[in-house]
């Protein structure tokens, strides 16, 4: 069952189409990463999905309803890119205030513990760092036990420890049957969390499917090995002391290199990471 979907959505700002015939859906218990370069239409897609903008063509649905319906909005938790808090309220007070808007919120102490907010729980919001404000904002998206969480760049400005706490909370949410849609520029994050990737470029969906399929669509394997400066190969890229090859068949490439007498010190043969697959796709 889809908990959220866009159906053939077109959204224009003046003569520019921010979204052009965009469709995708999110199922129960699914983590979907919405990826694309700056200006691709990701934020507009989120705004339409959440009922914050109305498309000229197409529709958005949350739990089968209009996304502006209170019954639908109560089941969604959101962290936008930009978020502000009353500067004199303390972190614990903000968590309590947000939780009071829901019938069955997560206990305050549970949320504080999950997102490691204990050290800042007594501090005023106006004195928080950017990363601390971000962590609080992400935590609040989970306060009402939502069935769908939408996170726009959730771990931007977070350190490794704080990012790990957010990842753990996301995994727990999904284990409990919740769905999650995130945008991120940390492709390692998408790779660690998402089972499915929706790739948007210039307002259109150019790929929608399992992460493994996106990598396979690049049609290439990475072969990397240490090579002295005097060794150069056709289609190989220099990477410091190493050469990198993107090839359809890694095993065959290694055999060919050995037959050609190329020394393969510090050899690495592996599938592309998400970052490498996207770069390979853009380069054709």
For the regions a language model picked out, list residue spans one by one.
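Conserved ABC transporter NBD signature motif
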Residues: 57-72
